[in-house]
Amino acid sequence: SIRGQAMNKLYSLSIFIFLVSCQSQSNIYQKAVAVLQPGNESNVKGTVFFEQDKSNVIVTVTVSGLNSNSYHGFHIHEFGDIRSKDGKSAGGHYNPDGHPHALPPEKKRHAGSFGNLISDINGNVDTTFTDDTFSISGEFNPVIGRAVVIHAKRDDGGQPTGNAGSRIGFGVIGIAN
């Protein structure tokens, strides 16, 4: 009957809406981590922790193996593929909004374009900052499954990607508890 078909369609639509709402709620992660591995014969290692705080993400970076008192471009890249030793399998900068390359505090920049890490006399970095150009997961420029990359040189803000050189450390951004 027509009434039965209408009820079946309504029932199917209700189930679909329920499943979609459950899926979107379960994929909102609050914490993530990337464990860095060396690239291009560097000695870089460390961790990058991400914690969602309303519209900002708190980023905590602990890195060793950099040159003493040096600047290193630091970005989120498109893919979580870090199979290649040169890090190029991670793709280019993550740029879902199509902005030109820029450094913080510029608002219109690549998502997760963090500027530079600055190492101490021992080649270490231990820093925390916030960023509002992405989210860990959800609809606003999600970064779960992408890669974080440390470059060999300073990001000078130039086009198209800051002239930061080779990729000397990288890790996949994964879900943390």
Which residues fall in each region the model found?
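N-terminal leader/targeting pre-sequences
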Residues: 22-177
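Alpha-helix initiation and N-capping motif
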Residues: 9-10, 122
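Sec-dependent N-terminal signal peptides
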Residues: 10-19
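N-terminal hydrophobic targeting signals that begin at the initiator methionine
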Residues: 7-8, 23
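Short, Lys/Arg-enriched N-terminal segments with co-localized hydrophobic residues
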Residues: 1-6
